[in-house]
Design a protein with these regions (language model features):
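Small-residue (G/S/T/A) turn/hinge positions that recur once per unit in extracellular repeat modules
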Residues: 75-77
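Conserved catalytic core of two-metal-ion nucleotidyltransferases
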Residues: 3-72, 81-96, 103
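Conserved nucleotidyltransferase catalytic core and NTase-mimicking acidic/glycine-rich helix/loop elements
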Residues: 80-245
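Generic low-polarity alpha-helical segments
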Residues: 1-3, 199
Length: 245
């Protein structure tokens, strides 16, 4: 927070810094977000008080739009500067969640919205239309279900300063011994899927998100399918824990 008379100049400084940063990231291969969910968007350049208010609105008045925004902005992390800004924001978010525990159920329901990446006959579910018709979307169908599950469970456990999905599952495995195997398998699966996407991106000089299954070997397809069991297991855990049936 800054004095009111300094707010406009301070915001302008950080927007300019963000635009320089996002341009540099784009230059080295990070695609611009088509929905403009980037630091260079003035909408996301706010004071600590404004961010506290923003998260409070998302938690207390959830909607399809706020669920999408929550999935993005609950994964913030400290980069540089005053660590107390992050601590105070986290304190505010966790206090609001304590007062509104039903929001965990909202997040969990959102986390299981994507079905298993395999169909009834264990075939890959592929895109049915658009530019990527018949391609497998490894981000939406395999990575995001794990990311979303780890996020809601970590928030429910009040975990701080762990914003990578594999690390979250590893910490959850320590906290919940009865579900240790599920969490460890999820951590392994996430790292394997991320490695697979990276390899595909390097091979095809793209993001690696959409995969042409015909180009994969039988062994690669089997490896992918083994990872999918963890998605089913963690979604089943969420369904039971948050009474989603």
């Amino acid at each position: 927070n800054v004095p009111e008379e300094e707010y406009e100049a301070t915001q302008a400084y950080f927007i300019k810094l963000a635009r320089i940063t996002t341009r540099a990231m784009h230059k080295v291969g990070y695609a611009y977000c088509p929905a403009d969910m980037m630091a260079s968007n003035p909408r996301w350049c706010q004071s600590l008080s404004e961010w506290k208010k923003q998260y409070h609105i998302w938690i207390t008045d959830p909607s399809p739009e706020t669920q999408l925004l929550s999935a993005i902005f609950f994964d913030y992390s400290y980069v540089f500067g005053d660590t107390q800004l992050v601590t105070k924001l986290s304190d505010s978010i966790l206090d609001t969640l304590d007062a509104n525990p039903m929001f965990y159920r909202v997040m969990a329901k959102d986390a299981i919205r994507s079905p298993s990446p395999l169909g009834f006959f264990r075939q890959f579910l592929v895109e049915e239309g658009g530019d990527h018709k018949d391609f497998f979307d490894i981000k939406a169908r395999a990575l995001m279900p794990l990311i979303d599950a780890a996020r809601v469970l970590s928030l429910n456990h009040k975990l701080r300063n762990i914003n990578n999905t594999a690390g979250r599952f590893e910490r959850l495995a320590e906290l919940e011994q009865n579900n240790k195997e599920i969490y460890e398998n999820c951590s392994y699966a996430f790292k394997a899927l991320l490695k697979f996407r990276t390899k595909q991106g390097i091979l095809h000089d793209d993001s690696g998100r959409f995969i042409e299954l015909a180009t994969l070997s039988k062994a690669e397809k089997l490896k992918l399918k083994r990872c999918f069991k963890s998605i089913h297991d963690i979604q089943e855990l969420l369904t039971l824990r948050y009474n989603l049936k």
